């Protein structure tokens, strides 16, 4: 969401103080490459602003930590402390306190900087492999600047069903953008692969481009014979 649109949303919430709150799920915001990170709504609004900020450490650290967190605006914090003062979470206090010290000591910031460098190099290697395996007129890449996945849109694509079958045949774990189209009306989603690279070994990036090319060729040949 552009910064101008974020400001409009905050202005909308501010017109009804105490009655309108924005829930901001800032998933994957830590991983933004090539451009400066956009400010969060919570950061723009300040501690008294109408934003409830949610995030998790499942990507930035590890899913096994099982820790998410919430930043409440001060007008809601007192009510939350009163209502949930006896609440006991499923994560031990030892893990919570360890993470808190990891963050306040500046270690988390340095950890994220190292992760961004590593993931950017991995993304660049995957993009280079795709551009080597596919001609420019065959494939368009999008969503390269943030998150740990990218979109590979095939030009003149075979049916998505053929792509799914070929992916199983070649042992490729990837989603199709149409899997997220609940209405089935987004025609632009057809033939678009969602390629996650967070857990892709660096040494496998080149082979990934070649395998995807074979997958797409097999899907197109299979659809032509039907």
Outline where the language-model segments fall.
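Short hydrophobic/aromatic beta-strand micro-patches
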Residues: 71, 151-153, 196-198
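Active-site-adjacent capping/gating segments
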Residues: 47, 160-164, 174-202
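Active-site pre-lysine segment of PLP-dependent enzymes
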Residues: 1-18, 28-60
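PLP-dependent enzyme catalytic core of the Aspartate aminotransferase-like
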Residues: 169, 186-226
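Structural signature of PLP-dependent enzymes
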Residues: 81-84, 105-127, 157
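Active-site PLP attachment segment
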Residues: 43-82, 94
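Conserved glycine-rich beta-strand-loop-beta hairpin in the small C-terminal domain of fold type I
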Residues: 100, 116-127, 139-153, 163-166
């Amino acid at each position: 969401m552009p910064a101008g649109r974020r400001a409009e949303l905050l202005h909308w919430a501010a017109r009804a103080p105490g009655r309108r709150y924005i829930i901001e799920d800032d998933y994957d915001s830590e991983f933004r490459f090539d451009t400066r990170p956009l400010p969060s709504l919570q950061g723009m609004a300040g501690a008294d602003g109408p934003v409830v900020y949610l995030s998790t450490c499942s990507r930035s650290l590890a899913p096994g930590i099982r820790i998410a967190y919430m930043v409440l605006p001060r007008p809601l914090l007192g009510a939350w402390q009163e209502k949930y003062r006896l609440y006991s979470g499923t994560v031990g206090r030892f893990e919570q306190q360890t993470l808190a010290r990891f963050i306040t000591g500046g270690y988390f910031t340095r950890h994220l900087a190292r992760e961004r460098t590593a993931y950017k190099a991995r993304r660049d290697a995957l993009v280079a492999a795709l551009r080597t395996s596919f001609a420019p007129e065959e494939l368009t890449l999008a969503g390269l600047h943030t998150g740990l996945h990218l979109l590979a849109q095939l030009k003149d694509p075979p049916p998505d069903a053929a792509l799914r079958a070929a992916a199983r045949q070649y042992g490729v774990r990837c989603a199709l953008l149409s899997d997220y189209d609940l209405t089935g009306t987004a025609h632009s989603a057809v033939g678009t692969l969602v390629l996650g690279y967070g857990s892709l070994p660096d040494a496998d990036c080149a082979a990934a481009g070649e395998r995807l090319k074979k997958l797409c060729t097999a899907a197109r040949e299979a659809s032509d014979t039907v």
